[in-house]
Amino acid sequence: MGGAEDAPRAAAANGHGNGATVEEKLDELRRLLGKADGDPLRIVGVGAGAWGSVFCALMQDAYGHLRDKVQVRIWRRPGRAVDRATAEHLFEVINAREDVLRRLIRRCAYLKYVEGRLGDRTLYADEILRDGFCLNMIDTPLCPLKVVTNLQEAVWDADIVINGLPSTDTREVFGEIGRYWKERITAPIILSLAKGIEASLDPLPRIITPTQMISNATGVPLENILYLGGPNIASEIYNKEYANARICGADKWRKPLAKFLRQPHFIVWDNSDLITHEVMGGLKNVYAIGAGMVAALTNESATSKSVYFALCTSEMIYITHLLEEEPEKLAGPLLADTYVTLLKGRNAWYGQKLAKGELTLEMGDSIKGKGTIQGVSAVNAFYELLSQDSLSVMHPEANRSVAPVEMCPILKALYKILIKRELPPDSILQAIRDETMYDPRERIEMAQGHSLYRPSLLGQPKGDAKA
């Protein structure tokens, strides 16, 4: 059911034939985790969206041939049927790739895809994932994966858990996981890929990030929970496009994990600023929807997209200064992550489709073949949070106190378009063409030159904001 028999071939095909170096990295992490001989390191993905599936496939490709020392498995919910049109497209993908075709024939798995193509059989998302096909990314075949549909079975003995869930599902699923971990003596390491936030307004306005949701739901200390983000498009990463990422969190685990995750085509650096990276991970999805709208409405005008980029990044910088005294600068991988998401991510795609009329808001934010559009819920969360009068800031021109959201006109426009549905998508252009708007540099200078920091937004006293 896993992909163990294919692992040596996958390792060689993906440039990891040098077993000594790979095995040394694995042995080093096993020692740090206190793993005894004969007790494999258990890496478990929770959630099988595009990035979560690719991440587990990268681990399987790199380390799966060392099956006595490591096990990689992934959990996804059972029962999700593959529709006929997707089954037909999947069959085309299989037949276009000789290596995939031969693999399925060798595993006696090809016939079911013929039957699915003909409509004689219903395929399910968990069974095709076992063969290396992620429902949200059919065009990019992965290596075979060991798929578990029982959550308790998947996670109860995990050493490292990869959170590949949307932020909107993280609290619920990890709440269930927390019940299975009540008897655990040692806490696992959790690496979150989720990008999004929740807003809590009672008793005070505050932001809740996915790592905080996980800690609250499971009781796992924050020093064992990390975030990984970067300028990464899942399909391109698996196709060996050169990429980099940052793993963020406490000192204890981020450096060893950065070394363990690093591959020739996927460079992982470490950084202590968990909060800024998680918040930016949510913010970039917010503004990516607007970027897609602008691209579609202006016929891909480079000038208009650049204007939007300057304005939205200034709002992002402004918002992060409310959350931290000295946030990580929007530069390097943080800036690149924002850039690639505005350029090509699923949230930008969603904005384009809305602006072209090919999707409607009534269709919801879970789109077939794409998964959850996390920017929609993030727009609502950030707007609700920043519209609270108790967080008021001084308006530089009106010389009066206003809610922070008044300093973020693009966020306001996206809220009225996506959440309130008061304005059509083309109103995003008015938000970037307002003649009374000041230079985005002024917003950045306001953020950096004034005491915007509100420690209560993170639900903790001043000085304790950083992980």
UniProtKB/Swiss-Prot annotation:
Q: What is its EC number?
A: 1.1.1.8
Gene Ontology MF annotations: glycerol-3-phosphate dehydrogenase (NAD+) activity; NAD binding
Q: What is this protein called?
A: Probable glycerol-3-phosphate dehydrogenase [NAD(+)] 2, cytosolic
Record field: catalytic activity: sn-glycerol 3-phosphate + NAD(+) = dihydroxyacetone phosphate + NADH + H(+)
Please cite one Gene Ontology biological process associated with this protein.
glycerol-3-phosphate catabolic process
Which residues does the record give as substrate binding sites? 195, 346-347
Per the record, the similarity remark reads: Belongs to the NAD-dependent glycerol-3-phosphate dehydrogenase family.
Organism, scientific name? Oryza sativa subsp. japonica
